[in-house]
Amino acid sequence: MKEPSEVAALAATLTIGERATESLLTVLSAAQLVEISASTVGLTDIAREYLLSESPFFKGALFQNISNDEVDLLRKVHLQDDVPRPITTQWLAGRVLKADSQAQVMHAHSFAAASFFAQQPVFQQVDRILDVAGGVGSVSIALALKNPHLRCSVMDLPPMAALARSFSERFGVADKVAFIGQDVFSSEWPAGYDAVILSNVLHDWDHSRCKALIQKAFHAIPVGGRIFVNEMLLNEDRKGPIGPALFSAVMLLFTEGKQLTMSELAALLELAGFQQAVASARFGYYSLVTAQKLTEHPEGKRCG
C-alpha cells in the first residue's frame, strides 16, 4: 500500500474481517507506521523509510521467513469475523483449558494493578463486593489485604473456583474471600452485595455479551451500589496507546472482544442504567472506571 486507501478497501484486499482490520490498524497507528484520517489510512514517513521495497533501508528481509501458508492460516483462523475463538469458546462451554497455567497467567496479569487500585478511598465506602469472572480472586485478594472490612465473593467457572482457594490461603485472606463456582452468563447472580467488579473481563467478549454482563451487574445491586471496571483503555481516536493496542490484537487471536475507549465503556454503563461513570484512578495502562446505580430503573441511551 503505497498510496492512502479506504479502510474498507484495505480490508477487502487483505481478505480479513472488519474487527481484525480495526485491531491491526490500531496497533500500526500506535507504532507510528500508519496515519488514519476519517475512513482512509496511509503510510507514515517512518513506514515509507523502512517498509517500501524501493527504500535503501527496506526491512522486508526480516519477514521473508514467514511462509504464505502461515499467513494464509493466520488469515483463515484468526482474522475473519465470526470465527470461533479458542478461549472464549471453551469458557462458554463451561470448560477452562489448562486451568493451572491460566490461573497463574491471570494472577500475574492482574495483581499489581489490583493492589494499587485497592488503595483508592472509594473502597472504604463499600462492604460486600461480587467479583464477576474473577478467576482465582487476584483482585479480591488485593482488596481484602488493603481493606480489612471488605468481604468479597469471586464468581467464575467451577474449574477456576476449585483452584482459587490456594491463592487466598497463600495471602492469608481465606476468611474474607469466598468463591462461587458458576457460569456468569447463564446463572442467576447472588444477592446481598453493594458493589460489582469486572476486572479484565469485558475485553474478552463481544458487544452483546458486554451489555449482558453490565445489565446483570445493574440488577444485582441496590440503589446506591457501585460498579468497578478495570481495563486498559484505548485513546478516543483508537490510535493508541501501544500497550492497549497490542493487547487488543491479542484478544483478536483468542477471544471475541477488544479493548474499549472510555466513551465506549461509559456508553455501555449508561445503557444498563449506571450513572456518573469516571476513570477514577490509573496504574500504567490500566484505568479503574467507577459508576453508580442511582435509580432502580435504567434510563440509559442506546449505544448500538
Where are these regions (language model features)?
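Alpha-helical subdomain
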Residues: M1-A30, E35-I36, F123, R128-G304
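Conserved Class I S-adenosyl-L-methionine-dependent methyltransferase catalytic core
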Residues: K2-S5, A12-T13, E18-D127
